[in-house]
Amino acid sequence: MVSSVPKLHALFVSKSQPVLRAAKVTNEERSTKSKLARSLARAVNSNPWSDELESSLSSLHPSQTISRTTVLQTLRLIKVPADGLRFFDWVSNKGFSHKEQSFFLMLEFLGRARNLNVARNFLFSIERRSNGCVKLQDRYFNSLIRSYGNAGLFQESVKLFQTMKQMGISPSVLTFNSLLSILLKRGRTGMAHDLFDEMRRTYGVTPDSYTFNTLINGFCKNSMVDEAFRIFKDMELYHCNPDVVTYNTIIDGLCRAGKVKIAHNVLSGMLKKATDVHPNVVSYTTLVRGYCMKQEIDEAVLVFHDMLSRGLKPNAVTYNTLIKGLSEAHRYDEIKDILIGGNDAFTTFAPDACTFNILIKAHCDAGHLDAAMKVFQEMLNMKLHPDSASYSVLIRTLCMRNEFDRAETLFNELFEKEVLLGKDECKPLAAAYNPMFEYLCANGKTKQAEKVFRQLMKRGVQDPPSYKTLITGHCREGKFKPAYELLVLMLRREFVPDLETYELLIDGLLKIGEALLAHDTLQRMLRSSYLPVATTFHSVLAELAKRKFANESFCLVTLMLEKRIRQNIDLSTQVVRLLFSSAQKEKAFLIVRLLYDNGYLVKMEELLGYLCENRKLLDAHTLVLFCLEKSQMVDIDTCNTVIEGLCKHKRHSEAFSLYNELVELGNHQQLSCHVVLRNALEAAGKWEELQFVSKRMATLRESDDCSVLE
């Protein structure tokens, strides 16, 4: 409805109108443009694109053309890329001439939203959309190359780069920097080498500081620190001076490679150079961490004091890094000195949660649980909030010492305070809570364990073993529905339960009469590439039939036949009967035919008896004919009942067809329905059929007379 869209006034004027003279934009004009952009975006965001929406958009701002600023602001405010593109085309159709900036903005919008195919098509339509006024240039390709890289599609980035060159568009240093970063993040160091050579030798593009920082960081992250160091040394050849980021990157790479002495020399070289580049807190902290990783704590302490002597103020990361190294070396007295020294007028370091976590872990690792608990209590005394790491270390240690009561107290506190849902940077580890999950699930407290587990899931933490522990716990406690819900969650996260978990859950669901859930679990089991034993199929089918779930029973029988699962004649008969009783005779006959085609039988007498009792005589007629087709014996009394019933309901043709079939097979002699059939045919005026029956009756009388004479 037009009325549902915010009323807008005439947005565009004729192209024939004179162009307004450029004037200084006032704050009031800016406010008007922003307000108009918000109104346009609000209309687009809150309504599906339609002729009504376009009509309403066209009714804004009479006698004034829309400004370039308004178009750009509107594009930035539109939420859905497809709507943004429609708006882009719509203003163009109304006479607005897009320039380079709006094309670039639209391309960035599509790329950020991962609409990459649309973005690619848009890129190659720029010249057409602008009537040749806007030419393809490297910045457009750079945008889409970055978008492909952010989506993890590095090969598409490379292909687009090749296309760019084939079209005669020279890559810029920004193009090469983007592609180098993408390749190195994917570990394609060889391709990055080749690209760097192509950059210099083929295109003559001079690397800048960002290029070298990208290469050095990429090679360091790919454990190629020697190559990174060589690139670092080559910077002077290109008159490109390393900045502090460059130095810090190479120092970090060397430290991670265990070459801490060389990293120290690099830092010392920074100090000796008469440049504006000096080591900062990151430089020293990285070196401290490097020495701590090699357990050269004395050297780490010396670097720390050297940092202080040069007037650099350590930050929390510096202190925590050194404290971690000292605690792992069990040099606790020196930690006190560091903390005391960190409270002078210069440094003013206040221990944070990370500091206490380091100390707690160190004490736990050393087997000093009481000391760890004291540190934890001191943390609370200082009004600091323990995070997931604080609790997980203590809970795991208590479980290892079989002190489950104390562990459970902390576990409950963890849940009640919603520690796992906190915004701390420390991502919880599910494995740390597994011992507690196992204990609770083994002691009838699975619900308590699941509460914490669901908090972990909300933080994006996944752990397949925990799912099994909880599902098993619920099953052990007879709570099969919660177990089923966890299994569904597990599969949604693309984790596959094991065979034992599936079988345990199906068995439990059947025990409480949850046939549909058991059937669903069985189907999920099959989709997980497991094939249950025949008894599992039979158990589920029996419960479905018992609960009168006709459609599900039908589906399961057909599935069993498809999977070549052995059939049970009693169950098959029960399912066919259920389908007949549910007015689904087509499915009933289909099942019967499929069973017989696969070499299985049903209890025909039972089915025919049911159909006759319930006056489903046409179905009984069809079923008897099927039996005769398959050469299966049918009780003659049943045939009499079917024929007489059909006659009674004036289904003379069906009654005669069955009689005729019995005659052809020589099975009519024992029939007692001749008179009933003859009378019905006579009343219906079916003389030809009447004559046929009469002849058979005469033949039978003659045969009987001969038998008497003999």
UniProtKB/Swiss-Prot annotation:
Name the species this protein comes from: Arabidopsis thaliana
Q: Which GO terms describe its cellular component?
A: chloroplast
As listed in the record, the transit peptide stretches over: 1-21
The protein's name in its UniProt record: Pentatricopeptide repeat-containing protein At1g02060, chloroplastic
Q: Which UniProt keywords apply?
A: Chloroplast, Plastid, Repeat, Transit peptide
Q: Where are the PPR repeats?
A: 137-171, 172-202, 208-242, 243-277, 280-314, 315-351, 352-386, 387-421, 429-459, 463-497, 498-532, 533-567
Query: Could you tell me where this protein is found in the cell?
Result: Plastid, Chloroplast
The text of the family note is: Belongs to the PPR family. P subfamily.
